[in-house]
Amino acid sequence: QSAVKTFRQDSSVIAYSQAGSSFQSFVIPERLEHFGNDEEGQLRRQAISMAIDRDQIVKKVYNNTKTPTTDFTSPLVPEYVKKLEQNGSNLKYNASKAKELWKKANAIKPWSGNFRIAYNADGGHKEWVDAVCNQIKNTLDIDAAGEPYATFSDVRNQVTNRTIKTAFRAGWMLDYPSAEDYLNPLYASSSAD
């Protein structure tokens, strides 16, 4: 049982809850049907992002012990910004816009199948993945669910070998307080290989 909802009231511990240097996300590989590097894929990615109420997840799943995403880095790094100038709206919950974008994508190619997020069951990710998938399912009216793997290495091997057939949980913890330590290892073209 998680103590995330009670640790602040526990007199046997000194409670500490500040912004950290790690983050959790999920990645949708371009090779998945409906998510290529084309207009349909871009619309679906935007719709999924806008279908997620990050504030609600932080409140309900983490009892306000996390910080909702507003940037590609952490509040601990000097380059952190609270609002991205370009595409920052993609990180804000907007169910009506998400539905509109999904409908536009369906006009290009009708949705088929399901949406899954793979995660390692040994790492405490079930709650947030389930919450994200429920929000996507309820907003976009599609079959969305988490797909548990027993261990981190089970998921990571498929990701590394590029054989995973679903979106997958990702995370990062910086080594030193610089935006480069987030951006280069995660988003540079060279980091994919």
Q: How would you label these PLM feature ranges?
A:
Residues D10, S21-T70, G113-G123:
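Alpha-helical secondary-structure segments
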Residues A3-S17, I164, S178-D193:
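Ligand-binding "clamshell"
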Residues F35, T67-A105, D122-E127:
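Structural transition elements
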Residues R8-S12, E33, S49-K66, P78, ...:
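Sec-exported extracytoplasmic/periplasmic mature domains
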Residues A3, E40-R44, D53-I57, T69, ...:
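Stable alpha-helical elements in mature extracytoplasmic
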Residues Q1, K103-L174:
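Ligand/substrate-recognition segments at binding pockets and active sites
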Residues V4-R8, F26-V27, F35-N37, G124-W128, ...:
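Extracytoplasmic/secreted cell-surface and envelope-processing proteins
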Residues L43-Q46, V58-V61, L91, D143-V155, ...:
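Extracytoplasmic/peripheral linker and loop segments enriched in polar/acidic and small residues
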